[in-house]
Amino acid sequence: MSDRCELLVIGGGLIGSAIAWGAARKGARVTLLDEGDIAYRASRANFGLVWLQGKGLGHPDYMHWSIRAGQLWPELSTILLKETGIDIGWRGGGGLHFCLSESEMAARRALIARSSAEGAAIRIQLLDRDALHEIVPDIGPEVRGASLSDLDGEANPLLTLNALQLAFQQNGGRLVVQFAARNIRSEPARGFVVSDANGDEISGRRVVLAAGLGNNELARQVGLKLGLTPERGQIVVTDRIAPFLRYPSNAIRQTREGTVLLGSSHEDAGFSTGTDVETIARLCRIGTRVFPALRAARLIRAWGALRIMSPDGLPIYEEAPEMPGAYVVTCHSGVTLASLHALELGPALAEGHLGPAPRSMRSTRFAL
């Protein structure tokens, strides 16, 4: 495994696969290292939302970065379908944030006003109960209204990951599976050399660390301290029922196959990906308050997965000052930002720079 490539991407999840495909489409020789099924794969339990309303408030660079990603999602879906024949389940047209009290309505009203004041290029309207009932007639009596944005949407995260990796290989990329990167070093003649626990090595002129929570240790080896921590999210899924919800929402999403996802939680549970009855019951209570008919649905599965959280919750995009050519990319919005990672960041990294990634998203903003 000594073939040298131009760009070596560590991490075969949504972030790494999107970057690798984008770089390969640019013409770079790219190798993607995938740890395999032992990885804490966030896409396995992702809610599948492309969610922009309210994102980045108080952080203008992140807000504009996220909105740009939302604008690029139709293009990403179209290209992947053309290159792979895989329909990733993209559905745009807006998303709903349901409100179950007048105080929640007031909070959404304030969010919309703040979003407008900060210059967000997204249209968010607040629907009262009557207006909401016209487009979602099955809402329960406790629902007071909802905010509806124009950029929010949804996609199937597993199909998106599959399509990205297939398209990557069709564009000449090399996918190496069951390679759990453990060590990184720089050599004058070989560039960056990455080895696994077995001593196997792969080298590349440049390297991108997109290994999720594994980035903590890998980044340390290139001189960066990230302070990433896991945050567990649990999701519940029902059996297939007749279509009733054509918009994705903050707590409830009906897939095109008919199943309903209820979620998700935000928990400090270490590296546990388990579930608990209390959280599952809370998610079900919220779902049935919004749509009482869900009380008749049969629950078939619940699961947990880990989000990758930086100290302030925002992404990190950085080139290691001590080891130029080594880049770190990490975020907890792998679905939302996949379009931007694939269509703009990946091509930039193929050329040896971070392109449009905001400088304010370097790890130097933390006092670690």
UniProtKB/Swiss-Prot annotation:
SS bond partners: none
Enzyme Commission code(s) on record: 1.-.-.-
GO CC, alphabetical: cytoplasm
Coiled-coil zones: none
Listed InterPro entries: FAD-dep_OxRdtase (IPR006076), FAD/NAD-bd_sf (IPR036188)
Domain of life the protein comes from: Bacteria
Enzyme class: oxidoreductase
Pathway assigned to this chain's UniProt record: Opine metabolism; octopine degradation
Pfam families: DAO
Molecular functions per Gene Ontology: oxidoreductase activity
PANTHER family for the chain: FAD-DEPENDENT OXIDOREDUCTASE DOMAIN-CONTAINING PROTEIN 1, SARCOSINE DEHYDROGENASE-RELATED
Assembly notes: Heterodimer of a subunit A and a subunit B.
Protein name: Opine oxidase subunit B
Native species: Rhizobium meliloti (strain 1021) (Ensifer meliloti)
